Amino acid sequence: MSSQKRADSSSSFDQAERRSLDENERKKKYFFNREGSGIDNFETDDRVNEIINEQNEENVIDQSRWSKLWRIWNVGYSWFILSIIGTTVGFAAYMLDIVTSWLSDIRRGYCTSHWYYNEKFCCWYSETMGSSCTAWKPWTYKFSLNYLIYTAFALLFVLCAAIMVRDVAPLAAGSGISEIKCIISGFLRDSFLSFRVMLVKCVGLPLAIASGLSVGKEGPSVHLATTIGHNISKIFKYAREGSIRYRDICVASAASGVAVAFGSPIGGVLFGIEEMSGGYDPKMIVYSFFCCLSAVGVLHMLNPFRTGQVVLFEVRYSGSWHFFELLFFCFLGIFGGLYGEFVMRLFFLIQKLRKKYLSRWGVLDAAFVTVITSLVSFLNPWLRLDMTLGMELLFQECKSSSSPELINLCDPSLRTKNTILLLIATFARTIFVTFSYGAKVPAGIFVPSMAVGASFGYMIGLIAEMIYQRFPNSVLFLACHGSESCITPGTYALLGAAASLSGIMHLTVTIVVIMFELTGALNFILPTVLVVALANSIGNMLGKTGIADRSIEINGLPLLEPEKSINSSNTINIPITEVMASNLITIPSIGFTWRKLLGMMEGYDFSGYPVVLDSRSNYLIGYLKKSSLKSSFEAAKLEPSFTFDQQLCFGKVDSVGDSKSSKFGESDRIDLSAYMDVNPISVLHTQSIANVAVLFEVLSPSVIFIEKDGNLVGLISKKDLLLASKYYQEDNDLVNPANRHRAVSTERINDSYENIELKPLKLNIE
């Protein structure tokens, strides 16, 4: 295409505007090459076309004689797939619970009667009845040897987990919630949900937890459940990746992961709504609820805790709370907010240093953190215990258990000592969490944060109890009426756990419901709501978002949030022309052959190409995805009349003349309109970045076209808009992000069409 022709086709977009865009490109290209590295690992879906395709399928079914049977089949098939996913998630959770508890206890001793029993089951099924358990034996009665064995087992477990992650599935490291949130929002990454990742997550998670690292299973359980849903839907060919149905499966699977991790089906559904999906969809909620019920039902049937309960620990408090305790409860809420912000800031600082100095030494990094954690934890009873067991003891009333640890904790003469031990445990575990969560092993942060809050809460309860014992007749304690047991420290541990979890995740309703389902403490509704709301408010004032959203932002993961664009003064008034791709590779509706089309696809590997009326007018008539072009080419090759110089057309074009065209058959032209999106989404060039962000969020197309005076002047993809919004929110001078991929010379490609040599490269055209 000559320079004059290119100028004619660009007449609707004046040269001054183009010079401005080119100058921006030169000044800002570095930023987008740097920030786009994480985004490029993801593919974008096209939800608009998926909705249209599903509607077309519905129309075909409606025209069938068996439409009612087809609809019954489709509905029943959906519930069948969800039940399979829920059942598999429940069984996986059962195995995780059993294996994790055994590995955690084997560091401290073994069962003489049944080697495969953990300490709790060993004592339950032992023939010896009484306060002491003789069937469970420590490895040795020497403190130094037990210390060494405890650390050696921890090192062995973490090495196995870290090596598996490094050599088999690096994407299995960490929690996975941030990436899954991006996938649900429309940025797809099939490798993150692969069978290999699922396998490593299943095997590596119990090892990582049993190693003594301050990590939990809840976040990885969400990732594991989503990989299960993804792979089952692929086996049954139930949902196309990127479709609305696929999104619902991912949300339902993620919700079931939380449900089985906490034994909280309603909490799992709320987690899917509040944290993962970012919106309210009745169908998605019903799917999530059914999947959670299936998973928790299977877990209840398998009964991993041998108590008939699916919750980690059930609490029954004989008394209630007093209004004067709200003062102490508020302190717990403030602590939760401060804890969350402190851990997040320190964690991301450590991660920055890890990426800079330890990116090649993930296994040694995890091993070093584990050894230090084990050496310190063994010296403190509340760090040495498994975190869930420790919380179970801290949540109890003193008169409700005969556990040796709880007996010591409830001894009035040991209050000062226990307060110091809990303070040390709180501080040490907070530091451990910041180092452990970023290790290259499967790792969650829910339970470690709850354990920190529980130890701190019980410590505050002991302090409140000591104040009451010192001043029983104070005005502050009039509601106690001189009762000996007026304050229950276990309730403070419960509320502290809720506050810390809210502070780190910035969730509200989900945490309140999870705590109720987890413990059954329904008479503490008001205090729980108070501490969660206070912790979340403190966190919002200090950091705005929780650790999952902040990980998305810091790691450069793609998540388009239009509310940020709308509320940002930097993007609300900036026209979309500042960030669009203006040098486009287009397909004219006339004068194009297979030879030119294939050469263009090999030379310019984009996900799709706009189709225009002709090279001069740039009037947009449709959009062709590369996958659709490949499908049309494979079908056309089967026709006897196929040649590489055969003319292509896209529907009825008046200027072509009388030559015939057909989809495939005896003609001099082939009509590809059936493979083209004939209703692409386009906006005027005067629209702002914020408005276009809303369109991407609501409709989720793969690309939006920009028009001026009826002609195509540019396009913007979801990835490019995401980078642009981020750049503006950082108050920088913006460049055209799309030119990371599309900064090519329109003149060069069109002039080269005449000299293309056919090469059997990416496309099998021989």
UniProtKB/Swiss-Prot annotation:
Q: Which GO terms describe its molecular function?
A: voltage-gated chloride channel activity
Cellular-component GO terms for this entry: chloride channel complex; early endosome; endoplasmic reticulum; endoplasmic reticulum membrane; endosome membrane; fungal-type vacuole; Golgi apparatus; Golgi membrane
| PANTHER family recorded | ANION_PROTON EXCHANGE TRANSPORTER GEF1, CHLORIDE CHANNEL PROTEIN
Q: Which family does it belong to?
A: Belongs to the chloride channel (TC 2.A.49) family.
Task: Provide the function of this protein.
Answer: Anion/proton exchange transporter involved in iron and copper cation homeostasis.
The protein in question is named Putative anion/proton exchange transporter C19C7.11
UniProt keyword terms in alphabetical order: CBS domain, Cell membrane, Chloride, Chloride channel, Endoplasmic reticulum, Endosome, Golgi apparatus, Ion channel, Ion transport, Membrane, Repeat, Transmembrane, Transmembrane helix, Transport, Vacuole
Lumenal compartment ranges equal 100-144, 189-196, 274-284, 344-362, 440-442, 508-520
List all topological domains (Cytoplasmic). Answer: 1-78, 166-167, 218-252, 306-322, 384-418, 464-486, 544-766
* Topology versus the membrane: Multi-pass membrane protein
Biological processes, Gene Ontology terms: chloride transmembrane transport; intracellular copper ion homeostasis; intracellular iron ion homeostasis
> PROSITE patterns given for it?
CBS
Region (Disordered) residue spans: 1-22
- Specify the superkingdom: Eukaryota
Q: Cite the Pfam families for this sequence.
A: CBS, Voltage_CLC
CDD domains attached to this UniProt entry: CBS_pair_voltage-gated_CLC_euk_bac, ClC_3_like
Provide the protein's localization. Vacuole membrane; Endoplasmic reticulum membrane; Golgi apparatus membrane; Endosome membrane
CBS domain span: 580-641, 676-734
Residue intervals passing through the bilayer: 79-99, 145-165, 168-188, 197-217, 253-273, 285-305, 323-343, 363-383, 419-439, 443-463, 487-507, 521-543
Q: Sorted alphabetically, which InterPro entries does this protein's record hold?
A: CBS_dom, CBS_dom_sf, Cl-channel_core, ClC
According to UniProt, where does the site described as Mediates proton transfer from the protein to the inner aqueous phase lie? E275
**Site annotation (Mediates proton transfer from the outer aqueous phase to the interior of the protein): which residues?**
E218
* Subunit record text: Homodimer.
